[in-house]
Structure formats: C-alpha cells, structure tokens
Amino acid sequence: MTAANPQAGDGAKRPFDLVILDLDGTVQDLYHHAPISDAVKSAIAAVQAAGIPVTIATGRTLDYVRQHIAQLGITTPVVTTQGAVVGDPVSGKILSETTLPISLARQAAAWIDAQPYITAFYFNDDEEHIQIYQNRTGDDSEENVAFLDHVFGFPRAIHTPFSPMFAADDAHAPLKFVVVEDRERYHVDVLAELTERFSPTLTITRTHPRLVEGTAQDVDKGMGVLHLCELLGIDPQRVLAIGDSDNDIPMLKVVGLGVAMGNSTPGVIAAASYNAPSVAENGVAVALQDLILRHITA
C-alpha cells in the first residue's frame, strides 16, 4: 500500500471536502457475489459523520444507483451513466444530462446493426426514468441471462434493429450504448474497433473486462465529477476519488487525490497517487481510514 499526505483543510481535521467512490469493483465486488461489507459501510458513515460528504461515480444509471446505495446513507448528488447524468439519489431528479447527438447515434446504431454483438442503448424518458433497449439476447443459458441482467440492468426491452429508433427528426437522444465483447467467439477487440470508427466524436471506454461503452464527446467520469464539483461549489483539488477500472482514470486525473483499488487495471494504478487493498480486502475502508479518519481522530 502506497501512502500519501493529504492536504489539510480546516486544520488537519478536514483533509478533503468530498469523497467520490466508484461502485462495482470498488465499493462492492464486480459481480455482486457478496454484499457491501460492514467495514466499508462503517467507514463511509464515519467520513460523513465527520462532515465530509461521500458520493458515487459510476457507469450505472441513476435509477440503479438509487436502488443500491440507500444502505450507505448517501444524499449528495451522484455521477452516473458514465458521467452523462448527475442526479439526486434521494429524489431521483436529474441535475445535468448529456446525450449523444442524434446524427452520431444514427451512425453508431447503423454500425451496431451490422455487427453480431449484444448491445444496449440507454435513454432517460420524459419522467426521468431509465429505459434500456437491447438488440439480442444471445444464448439462453442461466449464466448468460444472469450476466446480461447484471451488466445491463432494468427495465429492458428487445429492439432490433436499432436504426429505426433514430430515424425520425425528433428521435429521442440516447445517453450511451454498451457493447458486450466476445473475443472467444469473434476474435475482435471491440474497444479498438469502436475507437477507430468513432473517436474523438464519441468517447469510447472499456468499463468492464467484457464491456465497451460509447458516450457523447468528452463525456466520462472526469467530466461528470467536474460538473458535480461546480454544482457543489467544491474545488476538485479538494476531492478524493477511488476506482478500479479504466473508466475511472479520467476521474482520478481531475481530483486532488486519486486512489487505485488493489484489483485495479494497470492504467488505473498508473493514474493514482495511492494504492489501496482490493475490494475483497475492504480497500475503500482502508483508504478512508488512512487518508481521512486517522487525521480527524488524531
């Protein structure tokens, strides 16, 4: 574990003004095989009790986050949908939203329609709830169904091909799309293929060992965190952020102190200033204790 010296805020009692945590692979194991640990819950509660707000930045949707973090007592606005949506986890109100331009959504849909990959587009409806459209289901094995339920979320409907969804002049713009990579079957690096085709007009990011996502240009967790800091009136340099996957790298780069989990990708470790233990070893709790709580209680 690599230590760092956080800047003191109010004396040495408030080393940071905000803590931002990734969800999957950071707060909770990647496939949710185990619940959020009591150690992590207690550390988050202690940081918030000390007057430092804690929030979440995730590729998951606002609806999903609201359902899964109530147990953490988080009320600060959250960064969701890969940075495309900042929302209130209590009321569900969307505070900021960035969608793909329809012209680029059409291009992405046309490309996806010509590919064999399982893919989903994500939209917020008029009532600010998420709607997910998936093009195919793949095999009907229990393992595959459980995987897609876990990574895509709900509610989902099958819509194939995608292109007709974007044909009308007033078509609804999507927040993002998610492509499931299957290298064993297709022997294709989807990240490289999508990046070559759509970058920089879209932001293409690997968010999971088997998932590649597309968002609007410059939309990522880093941009979402900057929007959140502006909304809260907080200097990003007074923020601590913890993550494990490549989509966390932009977030770690814009904050004062970036923390990599022990289960992080090499890119995350390179972008971070502090290395915590893995999610299985309660890395979030260890980092919060070392970087915040021990300074407050000293």
Describe each PLM feature range.
Residues 38-145:
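Active-site phosphate-binding/coordination module
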Residues 46, 107, 111, 193-196, ...:
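Alpha-helical scaffold elements within enzyme catalytic domains, especially in hydrolases
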Residues 72-74, 81-82, 90, 198-200, ...:
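Short, structured coil segments at secondary-structure junctions
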Residues 65-69, 194, 268, 284:
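Hydrophobic packing residues within well-ordered alpha-helices of enzyme cores
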Residues 12-20, 39-52, 194, 198:
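A short, Lys/Arg-enriched amphipathic alpha-helix followed by its capping loop at the start of a domain
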Residues 3, 9, 14-18, 27, ...:
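Mg2+-dependent phosphoryl-transfer enzymes with acidic/Ser/Thr/Gly-rich catalytic loops
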Residues 111, 118, 122-242:
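Conserved acidic, metal-coordinating active-site core of Asp-based
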Residues 33-52, 97-104, 158-164, 218-230, ...:
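Short, acidic loop-to-helix structural element flanking the phosphoryl-transfer center
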